[in-house]
Amino acid sequence: MALAYDGAIQRLIDAFGRLPGIGPKGAQRIAFYMLSAPEDEARDLAEAIEEVKAKIRFCDICGNVCESSPCPVCADPRRDRSVICVVEEPKDVMSIERTREYHGLYHVLGGAINPMANVGPADLRIPGLLKRLEGDEVKEVIMALDPNIEGEATTSYLTQLLRPVGVKVTRLASGLPVGSDLEYADEITLGRALAGRREA
């Protein structure tokens, strides 16, 4: 029979165990670390979690996370407004920004088409993307979705949807492992994939 802890410690283990990428043993290690950590460190963590839940929202323009809308990327006049890079999640924006190779804007879909999880085009921020393409300022849309089945399905769907709009639609060059997530790609590989993008 598995050892279970009483009350607060088990609640903490269970809470950490619900986080992505944290298994039961990892959750237990983190919980016991927090138990022996200085009180101010535990308080800092709790306050940081509360603060992010209270202050962070999604940019009204691109869907990236921010404290005030528009986000710093959309508000930056130095960004190239003729290019929009479409990504699945805000974490993908961070991955691309780390490359220091991309200077355009972003559009965060909030996921990818996944029939197994009942996620269809209507569940994504596609109308916002189309609205941003209404003027003639945007010349290129880069599809930077995860190289997995869901990312490929979403890229294919959006490419067909955007062709009549008249913008150039490109996708990241090969080099990213199939079935992986953008957030796990190193900066050099991701930078080369951006630089070598090809017509979709």
UniProtKB/Swiss-Prot annotation:
GO biological process: DNA recombination; DNA repair
SUPFAM superfamilies on file: Recombination protein RecR
Function description: May play a role in DNA repair. It seems to be involved in an RecBC-independent recombinational process of DNA repair. It may act with RecF and RecO.
GO MF annotation terms: DNA binding; zinc ion binding
PANTHER family, sorted: RECOMBINATION PROTEIN RECR
CDD domains: TOPRIM_recR
Xref: Gene3D superfamilies: 3.40.1360.10, 6.10.250.240, RecR Domain 1 (1.10.8.420)
Protein name: Recombination protein RecR
InterPro entries per UniProt: DNA_Rcmb_RecR, Rcmb_RecR, Rcmb_RecR_Znf, TOPRIM_dom, TOPRIM_RecR
Membership in a protein family: Belongs to the RecR family.
ZnF C4-type: positions: 59-74
Record keyword Metal-binding present: yes
Toprim domain location: 82-177
Taxonomic lineage: Bacteria, Bacillati, Actinomycetota, Actinomycetes, Bifidobacteriales
Gene giving rise to this polypeptide: recR
Keyword tags: DNA damage, DNA recombination, DNA repair, Metal-binding, Zinc, Zinc-finger
